[in-house]
Amino acid sequence: MAKVIQLSDELSNKIAAGEVVERPASVVKELVENAIDADSTVIEIDIEEAGLASIRVLDNGEGMENEDCKRAFRRHATSKIKDENDLFRVRTLGFRGEALPSIASVSHLEITTSTGEGAGTKLVLQGGNIISESRSSSRKGTEIVVSNLFFNTPARLKYMKTVHTELGNITDVVNRIALAHPEVSIRLRHHGKNLLQTNGNGDVRHVLAAIYGTAVAKKMLPLHVSSLDFEVKGYIALPEITRASRNYMSSVVNGRYIKNFPLVKAVHEGYHTLLPIGRHPITFIEITMDPILVDVNVHPSKLEVRLSKETELHDLIRDGIKDVFKQQQLIPSAQVPKKSAPAIKNEQQFITFDEKPPEKKVPEKSTAPSYSPMKLSSVVKEPVDAEEKLPPLQFDAPPIVDQEQTLEVSDVSAEQPETFEQECHEEQPQPASDRVPIMYPIGQMHGTYILAQNENGLYIIDQHAAQERIKYEYFREKVGEVEPEVQEMIVPLTFHYSTNEALIIEQHKQELESVGVFLESFGSNSYIVRCHPAWFPKGEEAELIEEIIQQVLDSKNIDIKKLREEAAIMMSCKGSIKANRHLRNDEIKALLDDLRSTSDPFTCPHGRPIIIHHSTYEMEKMFKRVM
């Protein structure tokens, strides 16, 4: 039998590095979080070959004294917790004392640090061992350069992705940290080219604009709700701004960005029926709570956390998002064709947010688009050479905002620059009926789209989607009735299933009855339906009952709330006006009046838009009546 031995510190650090340092992005995350814990206000990150060749992080934080600097590269050495009680009230981003020794054990590392009092310290390490020590300048702060990452762990290096993928991971990490800490000016460069720069003024809206662009930032709404245990703040994109993945949904708890599926689920439920299937919103959710309610000591990466009172937090976020959208008019405006301009790629863009814009004469202003929660004034200047546009890092003042990304040149001449604060003050809750303007029908297109107008322009309404929304809200109430009014069928319906399917149906008969499907056994693996709720769509009963049963058969876990929801959606779709159905004027007027009375009149239950708006100004611009 093999003997039990004590592993060396060098081997222990390599084992720990397997969890802490998964890829270059992990190194960047740990070093930047250390800089933030050191009260830095400016952080500069320089990357070569997506971090595999070199990672440099420079900050103006507190720095370290000579002995502390050497001690920091020993396992479980930290200045952030001192006893067991501190572990349950962690307020810093780091606390385990594993990051620096783990990074040093799989790389060549140089650190230069000073507290600003006397000479600083410079250490050079290879594979976790200090090979040289010297004095350095007394500039306050810390500079760490990590090179030849994974030089002594070729297996890990073998599984690195392409430069593009690894750089994307680094950018994602830095973006989320920048959102969590808008008070810190962060600059990220790859081979000398800026990928991100924030101004550190504490306004997360400027960070959102730097990451996603001003066009998206204009269409993000503020969120702020609280309870006795939680305060939730952030920004959520209007439903028209969606992405194909969840990567654009950021969650922060007590300044630490995390990955938590229940929080993602809460956000999606807040957007319920406003998003198309398979699409996800852009959101930034910042949660503040007592540290004792969150356990961050779950995994060395500290991305996963355990939250106490998770259900309460889930409901707070979901209901808060729903309340935000109840106050908005969510009719998207059609885009006016613009002169084609090439996208500007891989060049530095300077975006200025004017807090007090100068007075200027504005051309005739367009009718305000329906989606205008906040206004950003932006000036896109001509790109300049990298050497000119990237001044050396200054610690006495945060650098200006400049963002390298693909930007489309937008026509902003028709917008009067205003501050975020002015725009936010303009937001007022609107009664449900006032969110949809009064429109006067003028006809139909292909028996599918209703055309209506008012003083603000032309509205195009999808008649099927409109009635689908109306019927969905009706059926959603009906399907939850405890004792629905039933109607006997003249000719009962029979259904036949396999043995396995029949076992599932028997197990979930009660759930099926709760949505109006009343099954009686009718021989081996067969069922008969003799009645159904009176409000079932006429002529669609058999197909609807079969689809609801199939929904139960296809689901691994039956959620009665979700089953009722799906049933209401199916009923509304089957019972609504189909395409190529020509309506009379009075039918159109009744449909629009009913739509105005719904709680969410802007999207169908599947998340597709119901109304599109062409403003009078947009129409005139398309016909060149205005330039």
From Swiss-Prot:
Xref: InterPro entries = DNA_mismatch_repair_CS (IPR014762), DNA_mismatch_repair_MutL (IPR020667), DNA_mismatch_S5_2-like (IPR013507), HATPase_C_sf (IPR036890), MutL/Mlh/PMS (IPR002099), MutL/Mlh/Pms-like (IPR038973), MutL_C (IPR014790), MutL_C_dimsub (IPR042120)
Q: Where is this region: Disordered?
A: 354-374
Q: What induces it?
A: Constitutively transcribed during vegetative growth, with a slight increase during stationary phase. Probably part of the mutS-mutL operon.
Q: Which GO terms describe its biological process?
A: mismatch repair
Bias (Basic and acidic residues) occurs at 354-364
User: Any coiled-coil ranges, and where?
Assistant: none
**What GO terms fall under cellular component here?**
mismatch repair complex
Keyword Lipid biosynthesis in the entry? The reply is no
Can you name one GO molecular function term for this protein?
mismatched DNA binding
Q: Which Pfam families match?
A: DNA_mis_repair, HATPase_c_3, MutL_C
Write out the similarity annotation. Answer: Belongs to the DNA mismatch repair MutL/HexB family.
Summary of the function given for this chain in its UniProt record: This protein is involved in the repair of mismatches in DNA. It is required for dam-dependent methyl-directed DNA mismatch repair. May act as a 'molecular matchmaker', a protein that promotes the formation of a stable complex between two or more DNA-binding proteins in an ATP-dependent manner without itself being part of a final effector complex. Overexpression of mutSL partially suppresses the high spontaneous mutation frequency of a ytkD/mutM/mutY triple disruption which lacks the system required to prevent damage by oxidized guanine (8-oxo-dGTP).
Designated name of the protein: DNA mismatch repair protein MutL
